[in-house]
Amino acid sequence: MNHPIHDQGPQWVAGFMSGTSLDATDAALILTDGERVLEFGPVAERKYTARERQALQEATDAARAWNWTGAAPEDAFEAARKVITETHAEAFEMLRNGAGRGILGPLAGIHGQTVLHRRPRPGQVGATLQLIDAIALQKALGVTLAYDFRTADVAAGGQGAPLAPAYHGALLERAGDGASAVLNLGGVANITARMADGTLFAFDTGPANGPIDEWVEGHGKGTHDIGGAYAAAGRVHEGLLAQLMEHDWFRELPPKSLDRYDFNANMARGLSLEDGAATLTAFSARAVAAGVAQLPDMPERVIACGGGRHNPALMAALAEALPCPVLSAEEAGWRGDSIEAEAFAFLAARTVRGLPISWPTTTGVPAAMTGGRLRG
């Protein structure tokens, strides 16, 4: 059943994303009816303080140790929920300050903070956990909240990820582009291709920034490889890279999904800082190339969005590994840092209209699936 605010037609919807890189809450406004993207509005970024990032990391670590066994680490989860509420409310206020008269609508889509994701296995349904205090956040924002986008898909037997493909497809349709694939380079990489008949085909390809960030941070050199400098100064260990590419993951057929920590920095154990960064960067690129090879049709180009596109070493490795050109989102005329936030605004609009947000070809769910819960 449609939500009453759907009756207003296309509207300005706010979207929010806090990724597994734990660097910031991204927010964006788009004008949409859940099928088309009509206009792009203001964007905002609320970076996390060291204290906030620590709370989110502690919740993630506690979730991994718990892994749905025994009592949940509620103290750590509650501290993270408080961070999510406060930072999202501040990001929303930043959007409000940047929006013109009448550009802040009655709806917001919130992803929450993923702290644990278990993909389905034969005979075992998957599980996923995004931390959010929907009651507190809806009260803080004062608009209808769409959230919890993944659990219905997982409960129905789907992977629960990726979910951005619905929006990627709308961007490609808006541009009249049926020949490109969209590559999101977050902690994990995922790719979306839009077939000639409009069918979306999407899946996680493997790691992207996650292991690289973890490797650099583990050496006390910051939270990520700024400018790809460490990777550029290192040597790729081809023997290790070949071993990594033998992982069972690359023999699995899509759709498929990963937890951020399914591939981690331990893969480079024993290497120097620079060589480890170079090898992990090359691995992320080769994993993407292996994923592109699993698409039904080879795209004419790949459009990269997400934080990884800011890493010149990763973009160079992708250009070398892929058989087609790699463009940044900006080269395609998109706002690369805001696409995931925009995606959850788009999914919120689809949720209030009762439209699907995942399909058999994007998450492996048995049939086109609606998702998301509404509050307010």
Ranges and model annotations:
Residues D7-A14:
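Extreme N-terminal starter segment of soluble prokaryotic enzymes
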Residues S18, A24-I30, P42-A59, A140-E173, ...:
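Glycine-rich phosphate-binding loop plus the immediately following alpha-helix
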Residues L22, A282, E330-G376:
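Glycine-rich phosphate-binding/hydrolytic loop that grips phosphoryl groups
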Residues A65-A80, G222-G228, R269-L271:
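Short glycine/proline- and acidic residue-enriched helix-loop micro-motifs
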Residues N67-L131:
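Short beta-strand-loop/turn "lid" adjacent to the catalytic site in phosphate-handling enzymes
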Residues G102-G112, D297-G308:
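Short glycine-rich phosphate-binding loop at a beta-alpha junction
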Residues L104-P165:
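Glycine-rich phosphate-binding loop and adjoining helix at the ATP-binding site
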Residues K221-R301, P312-E320:
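A contiguous, well-structured pocket-lining segment that forms one wall/lid of small-molecule binding clefts
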